[in-house]
């Protein structure tokens, strides 16, 4: 499991489901400790899905979105089957910039006072925004909160992937973690450096 979310939420945070989407792949990990019980990656990144399954113009109607969703579900199917079923809800955490952008756009609510930059995005909020966002030309999306120029073209594709993996794993809401892979790499380096300097 990416170490950054585990450090951010604390080692007693329980079972974490960590979702990270990049341009080319979607990575999902689940576990209760630093090492994940399951950690998988599939070729369903925001950029890849946009290029392969959405109109070149960047604008998509309901039929386009449903066709893209069907393709995404096929890609996600092996991943979903690998995750154990449980009656206990998982603490779902999103770590990527795409997820943070979507959460800001969707109006994610703040929770747990005292924790910096903590926000929650529900699947209903995400699904409410996706068709509206898809109907807007990419060059006009930067006027919306949370949509940065480098993600304006692929944010719909990323949103579809996040929506589909949340539905498949029965995740109703996702907490946005301000730390991502880069911070996790730094933490691992600091741990290794500290052990080396201290001789253990």
Question: What residues fall within each predicted segment?
Answer:
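Helical "lid/coupling" subdomains associated with nucleotide-phosphate turnover
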Residues: 1-15, 30-200
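Catalytic cores of RNA-modifying enzymes
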Residues: 19-21
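Acidic, divalent-metal-coordinating active-site segment for phosphoryl/phosphodiester hydrolysis
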Residues: 24-30
């Amino acid at each position: 499991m990416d170490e950054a979310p585990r450090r951010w939420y604390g080692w007693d945070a329980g079972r974490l489901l960590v979702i990270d989407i990049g341009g080319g792949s979607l990575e999902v990990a689940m576990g209760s400790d630093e090492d994940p019980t399951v950690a998988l990656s599939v070729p369903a990144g925001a950029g890849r899905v946009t290029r392969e399954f959405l109109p070149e113009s960047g604008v998509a109607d309901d039929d386009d979105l449903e066709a893209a969703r069907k393709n995404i579900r096929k890609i996600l199917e092996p991943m979903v089957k690998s995750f154990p079923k449980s009656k206990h809800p998982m603490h779902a955490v999103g770590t990527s910039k795409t997820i943070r952008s979507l959460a800001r756009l969707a109006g994610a609510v703040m929770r747990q006072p005292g924790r910096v930059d903590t926000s929650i995005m529900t699947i209903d909020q995400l699904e409410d925004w996706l068709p509206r966002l898809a109907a807007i030309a990419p060059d006009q999306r930067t006027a919306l909160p949370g949509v940065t120029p480098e993600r304006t073209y692929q944010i719909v594709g990323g949103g579809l992937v996040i929506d589909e993996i949340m539905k498949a794993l029965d995740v109703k809401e996702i907490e946005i973690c301000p730390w991502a892979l880069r911070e996790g790499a730094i933490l691992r380096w600091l741990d290794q450096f500290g052990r080396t300097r201290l001789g253990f």
